[in-house]
Amino acid sequence: MASLNDICYEKIKDNFYYGLFRDFKLVVDKNTECFNATKLCNSGGKQFRQWTRLEKSKKLMEYYSRRGSQQMYEIKGDNKDQLVTQTTGTYAPIDFFEDIKRWIQLPKASSASGVVYVVTTSILQVHNVFKIGYTKNFEERLKTFNDYRHSLEPQFFAVAIYDTDNAKKLETTIHKKLKDFRSEGEFFQVELSVIKEAFLKEDCCLKDLDYEEDHSNSFTDLNDKLKTLNII
């Protein structure tokens, strides 16, 4: 194969084509001879941004950058347009194909996989108090929290959930990063932006949530509030 252009068999729009390479259906930009890495990862049930956060991936990108190889680039567009949706994403030179292919073929779940969650209540969030923990089943964990507190108001809700291959390790790492803000146990008094910053360089992926701030309730004294909610 001289280039990715040789594998193209169907035009999507403009310079974008479908191609078949080693049993993988790719979206190819004929102008650059690069493939859509985002779509390739999606086809394997994973997200490209997770791959970019791996240490091995960072070293690989640095290696090709030092060699002066073609760099990755992003194509954006209105995803309401079906044809545009098929072409948006990050494009990468063929040099990256094998590594990304091996990664998406790894088992998605392991005994250590799960999520690290950040939850709060409308009362706690007024004082920037958040609970950070890990679980394999967030819905069940949240239900357990709120069933235990069935007579108390308000209920816990999620402000951030991170998918990861090693949930316990990630939780421990985040707790260490935020140790100066620890209030009690898994509770931290710190701005949400600081918590999210702590996750940025870790091997995890933020899940999409519908979250709106609610400051309708407050307590004057934080310690009284925590005692009232049986936190301390």
UniProtKB/Swiss-Prot annotation:
SMART domains: T5orf172 (SM00974)
UniProt xrefs under PROSITE patterns: KILA_N
One Pfam family here: MUG113
All copies of domain KilA-N, residue ranges: 15-119
The protein's name: Putative KilA-N domain-containing protein 315L
Lineage: Viruses, Varidnaviria, Bamfordvirae, Nucleocytoviricota, Megaviricetes
